[in-house]
Amino acid sequence: MADLRQLMDNEVLMAFTSYATIILTKMMFMSSATAFQRITNKVFANPEDCAGFGKGENAKKFVRTDEKVERVRRAHLNDLENIVPFLGIGLLYSLSGPDLSTALMHFRIFVGARIYHTIAYLTPLPQPNRGLAFFVGYGVTLSMAYRLLRSRLYL
């Protein structure tokens, strides 16, 4: 069984860790961006969230939806749907001994696609910008899954 020193010497795993940190930080930014939009536009999902703006009926008017808030929230949800599978499959892929340059290509394309997807979602850029960014990132995750299944797993 590999000890921690061996794992730290695994260049692919260290590259994955770096890119996973970048993409998780971006996803954390989306949480903050959603909160910022909610506070700036005084749009809240729950009555207790708007208690500082009044009580009773006065507070209820702040429990509503807003297109700006919903756009950021949907971009964040899309991150959750795509980044979580990338993290799981990417970790297994990293531990399977792939070529460093191939792994870096996967990680860089995924991170670039997700950052571009967020820009396309929040700006908003016309389609097919967002759709292409989604499918590029999704394709990278599928590519890693395919390579992992083909080379290392017993089916």
Curated annotation (Swiss-Prot):
Membrane-spanning parts: 10-33, 63-96, 100-123, 129-148
Which keywords appear in this protein's UniProt record, sorted alphabetically? Acetylation, Endoplasmic reticulum, Membrane, Mitochondrion, Mitochondrion outer membrane, Transferase, Transmembrane, Transmembrane helix
Q: In which tissues is it expressed?
A: Expressed in the testes (at protein level).
- Compartments where found: Endoplasmic reticulum membrane; Mitochondrion outer membrane
What happens to this protein after translation, modification-wise?
Answer: Acetylation of Lys-42 and Lys-55 is observed in liver mitochondria from fasted mice but not from fed mice.
* Catalytic function, reaction form: RX + glutathione = an S-substituted glutathione + a halide anion + H(+)
Subunit-level organization: Homotrimer; The trimer binds only one molecule of glutathione.
Against InterPro entries, the record matches this protein to:
MAPEG-like_dom_sf (IPR023352), Membr-assoc_MAPEG (IPR001129), MGST1-like (IPR040162)
One GO cellular component this record assigns the protein to is:
membrane
Give membrane topology per the record.
Multi-pass membrane protein
Q: Which GO terms describe its biological process?
A: glutathione metabolic process
Q: What does this protein do?
A: Conjugation of reduced glutathione to a wide number of exogenous and endogenous hydrophobic electrophiles.
Q: Which of the residues bear the PTM N6-acetyllysine? A: 42, 55, 60
Query: Any idea of its EC number?
Result: 2.5.1.18
- Which stretches of this protein does UniProt put in the Cytoplasmic compartment? 34-62, 124-128
Listed name of the protein: Microsomal glutathione S-transferase 1
| Keyword Nucleotide-binding found | no
| Pfam families, sorted | MAPEG (PF01124)
Q: Identify the residues that bind glutathione.
A: 38, 73-74, 76, 81, 121
Lumenal compartment: which residues? 3-9, 97-99, 149-155
- State the Gene Ontology terms under molecular function: glutathione transferase activity
What the record says about family reads:
Belongs to the MAPEG family.
